[in-house]
Amino acid sequence: MPRAQDVAQSDATLSSPATPASYEAAMAELETLVASMESGELPLEASLAAYRRGAELVRYCQQVLERVEQQVRVLDGDALKPLAGEGTNEQGGA
C-alpha cells in the first residue's frame, strides 16, 4: 500500500518533538504548518496531523505567555500596567 506509506512519511515530517526548543521555534513551526495547510496540497490525514501539532504548539505558546505574564506581575508588584499608548493615555487614564 504505497498510499499508507506516503501518509506515514508525511505524518513523520509533520510530527516534531513534543516540546519546542523555544517560543520562537514554536511560532516558526506554527507558521510553517499553517502555510502547508493553506496550500491545500496536504492529504487529509496529513492535514489532521498538522492540525493536531498546531493545537499542541498553540497550547505551548499560551503556557509560555502565561508564565511570562506571571513573572511580569511578580516583578511589577502584581499590577500589570498597559504599555504607553495602549488602551489609556500616557498620563494615567480617565
Curated annotation (Swiss-Prot):
GO terms for biological process: DNA catabolic process. Disulfide bonds: none annotated. One of its GO terms (cellular component) is exodeoxyribonuclease VII complex. Its EC number is 3.1.11.6. Keywords: Cytoplasm, Exonuclease, Hydrolase, Nuclease. It catalyses: Exonucleolytic cleavage in either 5'- to 3'- or 3'- to 5'-direction to yield nucleoside 5'-phosphates. It is found in: Cytoplasm. It is an enzyme of class 3 (hydrolase). Its main location: cytoplasm. GO terms for molecular function: exodeoxyribonuclease VII activity. Bidirectionally degrades single-stranded DNA into large acid-insoluble oligonucleotides, which are then degraded further into small acid-soluble oligonucleotides. Heterooligomer composed of large and small subunits. Belongs to the XseB family. PANTHER family: EXODEOXYRIBONUCLEASE 7 SMALL SUBUNIT. This is Exodeoxyribonuclease 7 small subunit. It comes from Ralstonia nicotianae (strain ATCC BAA-1114 / GMI1000) (Ralstonia solanacearum).
